[in-house]
Every structure is written in C-alpha cells, then in structure tokens.
C-alpha cells in the first residue's frame, strides 16, 4: 500500500505508532502528539489535553501578575515602621512578614513560569512539541491552522477552559506543508489497527 513503508510499531506497547506519538514511561501509554509528562497535573500532555495545559500556564501567569499589581501599592508598608511618641515601634510585624513572603513567592513563580509559558505557546504557534522540537518543520502549516489543531476551530472557544469542539484532527493524521498526511494502516476488515493512542486522556487535574 502507498506509504506502508513509513508505518511504525511501538516497541514498548506493540501497537501501531502514529506520527508524532510517543510512549510515556510514567503512564505506560502510547500518547498522541505527546509533549511531555507533567508531574504538577499528574498526566501526560498530548493531543486531547494540550489546550488545557496551555491555558493552565496562561491563567496562572495572569493570576500571579494580578497579585503582584495588587500588592505593589502596599510595598512602602514594608519599610513604614510605626513609632509612638517615645520612638518605640508599635507593631505590624506579622503584616510586613506576610507581605514580604507573598511578594517574594509571587515574583519567583512569575519569573519561573513566565518564560516557560512563553516557550510552550511559541511551540504551539509553530506546531512543535517539547519532544520533537524543530526537527519536524513540515508540520508548521501556518499560525492559525497550527493553533486550531490544539485549541479548536472556533476562536471564541480558544481561551475557554472547556473541551468545546475539541482540537482539529484526530491526532493520527497530520497535514504538512506539502498537503500530505500520514496514512493509518488498515486491518483485514478495512478498519484501522488497534492503538491505545486513539483513547483520549482524562482531563487535567
């Protein structure tokens, strides 16, 4: 059959291995368009839940930025030691400590997650994954089409943390710049061979 020479079988699961899929050693599953295993959400980020991972990073960074802007006007209180008429400090140490800890943790998380979020959104815009990197440029079919394969076709739903209509495509066939797509091997009955990669992930969290 045309393209049969390109069909691969996963050595660890013994199942058909679609293009861009990888075996996750943590969940022991063959994952469609696998990006990485995230211990913070205890799940593998792949074709059917990558949208939620991207939104998780985006909204977490926005929340951290909002908290930072909210406490910024109170920063002078860290150095405003209230004194009585005799020059003795009146109090407020607990408030100053809490404010200082909040500021330090918020800035640290924002400095760590901000670049991480930008990296993953940049890869999404280029139709890349952490595993594939820039080794597969043929899957970069344009900014809009790339994002539709993750966020869905309806742009009003892109930033909604719900599945909605789901990502464009089935995670098995991937359009390329040349207009081609990977072929799915057929069994004797004319149906695709069994692959655990066709099973959707559970939602993040």
Role assignments for model-derived ranges:
Residues 1-205:
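Membrane-associated feature with strongest affinity for ZDHHC
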């Amino acid at each position: 059959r045309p393209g049969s020479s390109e069909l691969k079988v996963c050595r660890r699961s013994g199942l058909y291995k679609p293009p861009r899929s990888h075996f996750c050693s943590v969940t022991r599953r063959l994952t469609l368009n696998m990006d990485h295993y995230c211990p913070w959400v205890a799940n593998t980020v792949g074709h059917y839940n990558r949208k939620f991972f991207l939104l998780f990073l985006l909204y977490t960074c926005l929340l951290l930025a909002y908290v930072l802007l909210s406490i910024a006007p109170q920063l002078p209180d860290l150095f405003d030691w209230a004194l009585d008429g005799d020059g003795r400090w009146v109090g407020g140490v607990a408030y100053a400590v809490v404010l200082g800890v909040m500021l330090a943790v918020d800035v640290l998380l924002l400095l760590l997650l901000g670049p991480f979020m930008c990296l993953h959104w940049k890869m999404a815009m280029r139709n890349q994954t952490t595993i594939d990197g820039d080794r597969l440029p043929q899957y970069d079919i344009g900014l809009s089409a790339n994002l539709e394969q993750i966020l869905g076709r309806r742009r009003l739903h892109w930033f909604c943390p719900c599945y909605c209509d789901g990502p464009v495509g089935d995670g098995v066939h991937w359009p390329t710049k040349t207009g081609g797509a990977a072929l799915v091997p057929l069994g004797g009955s004319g149906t695709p061979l069994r692959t655990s990669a066709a099973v959707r992930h559970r939602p993040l969290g």
